[in-house]
């Protein structure tokens, strides 16, 4: 009986290898020399490539990688904190630093016409509403300290003076009066500031003065603007008799509300004072 001879053709060998791969078996590796001649078995140890160890997915990262990640995190945190500290706003400036800051940002400090250092020399008393200005001035002049002179500023007279002198606000006032439009916010305060600035440049303006602002301010916006641009107001005087008898007759409901808001605004900071014929001295 003839002995079975195993086929050795390349096609047959590839088919066998494919079958082994499907079956999960690794086909035998045959080491071949550069000229296609099979090498002896003892040479396989020198020419065969050792199998690499592949880390399984369930194996965790090595400790050195964890250490590197920790150090990198601390380094990044340190970098971020130093950058934030560099950009932290300054709470104090020297005069030169503040001037440089103003030039860079375009901001300007708001300068009052009369700063707090001169509050003892010039005392401003606001009278939001007075039915009869001349009568109210006579009453209040007796209550003010005698050691200071008294100056009275009335917005109505300021408007008449501005129109007569053809000042810088005269054309605006003419248009507003011609069309019976309300005065824009801040205009009365601008006229007040202009009048006070002129007064300070006179001889009388060099002496201690109590300044009565009659029928002013009649809105909280004007009050705030005055204290920002001109000076601090010492007291808001509430003429009790005028408020009780004439306020609603002289002003519209909206204006009454605004005047009461002014009184409430100064009352919250303890600067509102009610005055009647029985009061002898203003605080």
From Swiss-Prot:
It is found in: Mitochondrion membrane. Residues 1-47 form a transit peptide. InterPro entries: P-loop_NTPase (IPR027417). Keywords: Membrane, Mitochondrion, Transit peptide, Transmembrane, Transmembrane helix. The chain crosses the membrane at residues 63-82. Gene3D superfamilies: P-loop containing nucleotide triphosphate hydrolases. The keyword Transit peptide applies. Belongs to the AIM36 family. This is Altered inheritance of mitochondria protein 36, mitochondrial. The lineage of its organism: Eukaryota, Fungi, Dikarya, Ascomycota, Saccharomycotina.
